[in-house]
Amino acid sequence: SQQTCCGALFQHRGELHHAATLAQQNKVVFEKLKLDSIISTASGCGVQLLESGVGNDNCPVIDINQFLVTAEGWKGVKIASLPQTILVHDPCSLRNVLAGHEYAYQLISLIPDAQVIPLAGNDQCCGAAGTYFIEQSGVANILREGKVSAVMSNESLYLVTSNVGCALYMADGLYEKGVSIEVMHPVTLLARQMGLQL
């Protein structure tokens, strides 16, 4: 068998048996590989892998921002300048559970001339919250409106976030308001400045 979905969305919907089945499949696969760590590219998935017991002390779950920032060899890497303001959204999962939101800032700060600014209201949820934006759309839209307003009060061309659900939900809200801003993962923006296509 192979690596599969982390099961977070099933967990959020209350489908605990399905989420546990996926977690067990991942645990078996990862244990066979004898990994040093599990790198997660989406903070919500990282939390699910951690809390479902897939990651452990011998094989911790590490967010990709942290993994890259703590990697050696950055001095020789050519990164194109980007003299722009880059807003950083802190996903609740990264800030409150994985406790690693500062790594996204450090990663984006590797881009020369970038002005890295936290999105106002980062201590509050954007409203996506797994499946919350589907199940409680009214409240979720109110939460998102605060994020959209914070983006609109800046003249930034870039908003980075480490959670795919947050990215999609905020991008949709910004699109509805006619705001022209790219919403992407911090790694995607850094890769672009390195001349890589993800």
Label for each model-derived stretch:
Residues 1-198:
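Iron-sulfur cluster-binding electron-transfer modules in prokaryotic oxidoreductases
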